[in-house]
């Protein structure tokens, strides 16, 4: 928390990424988030927080963090890239004679849309 206070004051950032058990490029949801550390930081500064490695945070924990902290942004790129990669692999495997990139990529869009909607819904009330 002390480093966060110093950094926020000296840099005047709009948002601050913090590390509290989250890891970049985590492909499974096993991150053990230190909620107390996040709360200590948020109580020390007025700057909104960002969590990188959001793909590795279990959905219920992400939802709890979204409701109980001032985390304004969860990075979930790995989750989206994994969905895209799996959809593209399936398309290539099932259509070995298609070489046009647009035809190969188009079927990935519904999969990305589906996972994105699911992620957003998981942040909301249920």
Set out the residue ranges of the language-model regions.
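Active-site mouth loops of central-metabolism enzymes
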Residues: 1-2, 51, 104-107
């Amino acid at each position: 928390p002390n480093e966060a206070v110093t950094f926020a004051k000296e840099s005047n950032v709009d948002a601050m990424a913090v590390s509290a058990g989250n890891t970049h490029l985590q492909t499974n949801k096993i991150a053990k988030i230190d909620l107390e550390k996040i709360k200590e930081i948020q109580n020390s500064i007025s700057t909104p927080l960002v969590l990188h490695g959001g793909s590795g945070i279990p959905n219920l924990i992400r939802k709890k963090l979204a409701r109980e902290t001032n985390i304004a942004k969860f990075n979930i790129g790995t989750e989206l890239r994994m969905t895209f990669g799996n959809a593209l692999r399936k398309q290539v495997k099932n259509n070995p004679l298609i070489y046009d990139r647009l035809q190969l990529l188009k079927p990935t869009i519904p999969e990305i849309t589906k996972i994105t909607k699911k992620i957003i819904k998981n942040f909301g009330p249920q």
